[in-house]
């Protein structure tokens, strides 16, 4: 199961939140971003229950104030490799 999660953090906590989240093996990509959200993560888990477990951890984090989750629809799209 793959999902993208957008995260809002308490002001000034973004660097610490990113450092802590980097320790979770399910997170395969993490970036600080500008805009409505502060952090963008991509996760992979063996099943939907794994996504729920990650969301529970995120929502219980004292510096995470909001999340927005997008589950990947398999068979629609995928990575696009571009040659220079």
Residue ranges with predicted function:
Residues 1-84:
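A compositional/biophysical signature of low hydrophobicity enriched in polar/charged and small residues
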């Amino acid at each position: 199961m793959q999902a993208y999660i957008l995260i809002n953090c308490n002001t000034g906590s973004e660097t610490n939140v990113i450092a802590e989240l980097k320790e979770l093996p399910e997170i395969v990509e993490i970036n600080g971003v500008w805009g409505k959200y502060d952090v963008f993560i991509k996760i992979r888990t063996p099943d939907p229950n794994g996504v729920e477990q990650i969301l529970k951890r995120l929502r219980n984090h004292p510096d995470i104030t909001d999340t927005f989750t997008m589950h990947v629809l398999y068979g629609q799209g995928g990575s696009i490799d571009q040659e220079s």
